[in-house]
Regions:
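Positively charged, helix-rich recognition surfaces that bind polyanionic ligands
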Residues: 16-19, 31-36, 44-236
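Acidic carboxylate diad motif detector
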Residues: 1-43
């Protein structure tokens, strides 16, 4: 909903929407000074929770220098990995992801309970919300972890290079679908993109067909044939 003639107001921890009275809300953070509220988008999760996304507009010249000096830049390379989501060129502490697999047993248990309920009954609706809350918890854990990891990387490095891999195509593969969706690599890459832009830094997308694994890191020689079973590449 767009802001027109003061139809949307935000005061402290309250918000007023068109055709709705004042509603108490939990504000995530305060907007920066000098910004103007442009629109509000209200969404509802399957668990029954409501969220309001407030869009503010303004202009800032910060971090928009014409010439960037990367002579002393700290550079990080990131490669997608099925186990652990990613492999980094520098040592970065990571906790074990796979939040779906961690909660898979509990989710399956709640889904079995739902399958035994009579469709349309009160117990069915109640159990539906329990299943939705399980999915919501998994999404929240994954998003929180990726936000913290991407923030740590953008604070430490000036240039981040990532593989421009087609995540949708990989998720359609027979054996990779669950791992690809559970890792959240596409979401992680998007977070890096806008967070680096905020700080005036750069995200470089490397072509998916670039032979980075076949190329020697010292002399640059490319090994033409490199099997997936070869985990160590010794350049001659």
């Amino acid at each position: 909903t767009n802001v027109v003639n003061g139809n949307i107001l935000v005061e402290g921890s309250r918000i007023r929407l068109p055709k709705v009275k004042w509603i108490t809300m939990k504000k995530h953070r305060e907007p920066a000074e000098g910004l103007r509220l442009k629109s509000v988008t209200v969404s509802m999760e399957p668990s029954g929770k409501y969220f309001a996304s407030l869009l503010y507009e303004g202009y800032s010249c910060e971090n928009q220098a014409a010439d960037k000096d990367y002579s002393n830049a700290k550079i990080l390379g990131i490669d997608y990995a099925m186990q652990g989501m990613a492999v980094f060129s520098e040592e970065i502490e990571m906790e074990e992801a796979g939040f779906f697999r961690k909660n898979e047993k509990r989710l399956a248990r709640e889904q079995r309970k739902l399958s035994r309920c009579v469709k349309g009954s009160r117990n069915y609706v109640r159990q539906q919300k329990k299943v939705a809350r399980c999915h919501e918890k998994i999404r929240s854990q994954r998003r929180d972890y990726l936000h913290k990891l991407s923030r740590r990387i953008t604070d430490q490095y000036d240039i981040v290079a990532v593989e421009d891999i087609d995540m949708k195509a990989m998720s359609r593969c027979l054996h990779f679908g669950k791992s690809v969706q559970d890792n959240g690599y596409g979401m992680f890459r998007n977070m890096l993109d806008y967070k680096l832009a905020w700080k005036g830094k750069e995200l470089v997308k490397v072509d998916r067909f670039f032979p980075s694994s076949k190329k020697c890191s010292k002399c640059g020689k490319i090994k033409k044939e490199l099997k997936l079973s070869e985990r160590v590449y010794r350049c001659t």
